Amino acid sequence: MEQKQTGSKAYLISIVMVAVLGGLLFGYDTAVISGAEKGLQAFFMGAEDFTYTDFWHGFTSSSALIGCIIGSALSGVMASNWGRKRSLIFAGVMFFISAWGSMCPESLVLPKGAPNLTLLIVFNLYRVIGGIGVGLASAVCPMYIGEIAPSNIRGMLVSWNQFAIIFGQLVVYFVNFFILGDHIAPAIQSVGNGMNQILNGGEAAWAIETGWRYMFGSEMIPAGLFALLICFVPETPRYLAMVGQDAKAERILARINGAEEAKKILNDIKNTVTEKKEKMLTYGVLCIFVGVMLSVFQQAVGINAVLYYAPRIYEAMGFDNPMVLTVFNGIVNLGFTCVAIFTVEKLGRKPLLIIGSLGMALGAIGVAITFGNPNLQLLCMVSIMVYSASFMFSWGPICWVLIAEVFPNTIRGAAVAIAVAFQWIFNWIVSTSFVPMANSLGYWFTYGLYGVICILAAIFVWKLVPETKGKTLEDMTKLWKKN
């Protein structure tokens, strides 16, 4: 049977749309805590066998990040041994188990509705399981899309994974808002009283005892859909060539690129995958340092302190309905992510990172100056928006693009795993430290610190990060060899 000479764009798009569901789940899982954390706090404050301190609250709000570190660290080994597709199926299963377990941490064993230390530990274990799914998806989804997509549109398609992450965060902001509904105000007012408010019944009781369960449980829908649909997409041609399944790899390439082009691409892939593996420091320490520090700065600028605690921050500013502002912030984030998608190949990576760093510094310092002043409430909100929007067109998407591009071919798999693991480690550090630092040192100090780090990030990019716009991956190998 004669193969088509032109590829099927519809087939490619359908594959990518399934793959970016992993990105959507990445965003959904990491942002669901923003609406649930105050309910969780009030619920566990009623425990009699331990005291739910700021430390416990910070740990519970960020426990999924422990799993993210584990999942990202294992991503290279799993993707190489299991394949990209099976790794993503596993991630989908982890998402589903975590959503169900976080909704019902009692799991028919512990008494429902009775807060205690054992229940808190079980809840956090389920969040760690979800984090493993996030860590895997954060590394393998861009890898899968990059290996399945034609080279002329690869950058654009990989960027849509970041769009899906932000879209997932926006979706869960809406979900959280509609789950709470009229229960929002009573729930916020009751946090200081913990379970005392629950004992009186009413709207606060539902929000604190049940609302957060629905938020986590809602993730079962996209998680189940992703785990099911990913079963029907092909493995990547690059992985198939690595394990000697050339015929199958060529058939997939032909469906995407056409038969004639498929033969050329397969030859290039085979030349790449048969190259001798090199040691991590073959290209020097600077190469690894740049990749790792890109990940560190992406988190150290403090963006997840906004994403995870947005309702709490807006409430502390004095706004009556913080969930509405959180949803609006999500819409702004989505729009500015599109700015990056449409400008990264025109302006380059470094200019966007430097401009974004300075914009974040301006926004963070603005928050530090205006926070707590009722006369500057609107200016404080605008500063938060500037801070968040600046991240979304710079460090949010561009960091992932650079991490995928900056490492030489022969060390990319291991180097990306290390860089992404550092990203999740610092994500955990920032999100765990935010509440204790803000409560003890003040929001002004916390955001002032983030502003200083943003300025340091701009200097780092200016001095050390190479521009990868218009360069092939082989050019990066030559660059690091030269240096």
Predicted regions: what they are:
Residues M1-K248, I252-A254, N271-N483:
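Alpha-helical transmembrane bundle of multi-pass membrane proteins
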Residues A262-N271:
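Short, well-structured alpha-helical segments
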